[in-house]
Design a protein with these regions (language model features):
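Active-site anion-handling motifs in enzyme catalytic cores
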Residues: 1-381
């Protein structure tokens, strides 16, 4: 028996965001649970060599935003298509990614392939053209949506998606099991980090959107970390969860903070490598608390039971904190150094209690993430 064939044609994986591969690992766990018959999965990727090391159970074809011969072959012979993970419904960066999704959906319709969205997020759409693209060309064709939060379902309803086609699940990253600290500790020992003081893990972005909301972002983070070091003797681990280089990415934000900090002697940056999710999570597990602007760095913290403070630039981080009943969150546009420092200080002081609460909540989120199987089942029934 050759089994059923799924194409995952939206080629976000391998782009440089460690969270993407966490979602792909979660998807692989869902596929593995289906024991009726084998499922073969072909995944579009910007970096097949890296992604195949992270999730070796799938087949990969290179995608750079265009449809090549292998891409066309996979889409022709697959039984169904899935849009897996990330946030395909958004337009704050412009027409992408909805333009990609529209092309995939159009292809599915032309080839009479079933298509669903699995484990996806949404944001408010600001452009009328984006709204029409979703309501008129995408929503009528997509057979089912499993989404991260109730707010995602509300947004889809606002854009005319039939609510019977939507299941509230959770991010696929919740299906990645926690790890121990051994990998992270080996690196921290190599970097000569003292083990007898609190360790604050920091992940920040440096994209245009964030700087428009808070132009003094690097200076604010530097002031907060200086104060936390003076107050508690903490060390600071700066980590890029998005490893691409350039003005808009995490590594630039890290350097901007280090340049502005007075206590850079207590700060160190983890080498900017394309770490596997388990390696990133091991670094997080070594931390006392974390400060994050990225969605999956927050999930990594929650998975590891490490209290985090969220600087939310978009709806998905706010939605995550709401789901977790988590009050250590600030909107980026409203953030000031006093409030950020206060939240970090409270998280550090109450970390044992908060860690236990996160571990308890993790169990519920893992169960919810399992509901993503409904989109898989829908296209294969």
């Amino acid at each position: 028996m050759h089994g059923r064939k799924i194409a995952v044609p939206w080629g976000i994986f391998g782009s440089g965001n460690i969270g993407d591969e966490a979602m792909l690992q979660g998807f692989a766990e869902l596929v593995k649970r289906d024991t009726e018959q084998p499922i073969r999965v072909w995944v579009a990727s910007r970096n097949p060599a890296h992604v195949s090391r992270v999730v070796p159970s799938f087949k990969y074809f290179r995608s750079k935003g265009t449809v090549g011969s292998v891409h066309r072959w996979a889409m022709r012979y697959a039984d169904a298509y899935l849009i897996v993970g990330d946030t395909p419904v958004m337009d704050y960066l412009g027409p992408w990614p909805l333009t990609d999704i529209e092309k995939i959906v159009k292809n599915a319709k032309a080839r009479k392939k079933r298509i669903a969205c699995l484990g996806v997020g949404t944001e408010h759409l600001s452009g009328e053209r984006s709204v029409r693209r979703l309501t008129e060309r995408i929503a009528p064709v997509v057979e089912h949506w499993t989404v991260r939060t109730e707010n995602d379902k509300v947004r889809l309803a606002h854009y005319g998606v039939d609510q019977r086609r939507v299941t509230v699940a959770a991010d696929l990253g919740w299906l990645v099991p926690p790890v121990d600290t051994s990998f992270g500790m080996r690196w921290l020992d190599h970097l000569e980090r003292r083990g007898d003081t609190p360790l604050i893990g920091v992940n920040l972005t440096h994209d245009r959107w964030s700087l428009d909301l808070l132009p003094e972002l690097p200076s604010l983070i530097a002031r907060v970390l200086d104060s936390m070091i003076n107050r508690s003797g903490a060390h600071v681990m700066l980590f890029a969860n998005e490893v691409r280089e350039g003005q808009g990415f995490d590594s630039t934000g890290i350097q901007e903070v280090l340049t502005r900090a007075n206590r850079a002697d207590h700060m160190f940056a983890i080498p900017n490598r394309y770490w596997r999710p388990q390696e990133a999570m091991s670094f997080v597990a070594c931390c006392s608390v974390t400060l994050t602007m990225r969605y999956h760095f927050a999930i990594f913290s929650a998975l590891q039971g490490v209290p985090f403070v969220s600087l939310s630039r978009l709806g998905k981080l706010k939605d995550l904190c709401t789901d977790l009943g988590w009050s250590h969150e600030l909107s980026l546009e409203d953030a000031n150094s006093s409030d950020v420092e206060s939240l970090l200080g409270r998280a550090l002081e109450s970390r044992d209690h908060l860690s236990a609460a996160l571990r308890q909540k993790r169990q519920a989120m893992v169960r919810r993430a399992g509901l993503n199987v409904r989109s898989l089942d829908r296209v294969l029934d």
